[in-house]
């Protein structure tokens, strides 16, 4: 009986040791703001231990205004500007990409110039 209990305890310890203590979810921090006619487009994506690829696009309605791409491991920051935006128009920042080879849902941020 002691032998079986010890064996079960050993198996449980081995199983627990083989799983990570916690799995961190990816964090996304997008921002779209304007200074005069210049759009400031920003996204920070963090996922420890993973390769991140992303494309950040600035849209006005159905028109693609500008786009930028990048790749990183553990984190990726895209911080870009676009001049020539029109006052009163609404723009949308769209972020698409992959984390560890798996596509993440599109992230959007909307603001008016």
Task: Mark where each language-model region is.
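Surface-exposed, short loops/turns at beta-strand junctions within beta-sandwich domains
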Residues: 81-90
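N-terminal prepro-regions of secreted/extracellular proteins
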Residues: 1-36
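Intrinsic-disorder/low-complexity, polar/charged segments enriched in Ser/Thr/Lys/Arg/Asp/Glu/Gln
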Residues: 38-42, 77-79, 106-108
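Short beta-strand elements
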Residues: 103-113
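Solvent-exposed serine/threonine-rich low-complexity stretches and specific carbohydrate-binding patches
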Residues: 61-75, 109-111
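Short, surface-exposed binding/anchoring microloops in extracellular/periplasmic proteins
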Residues: 25-59
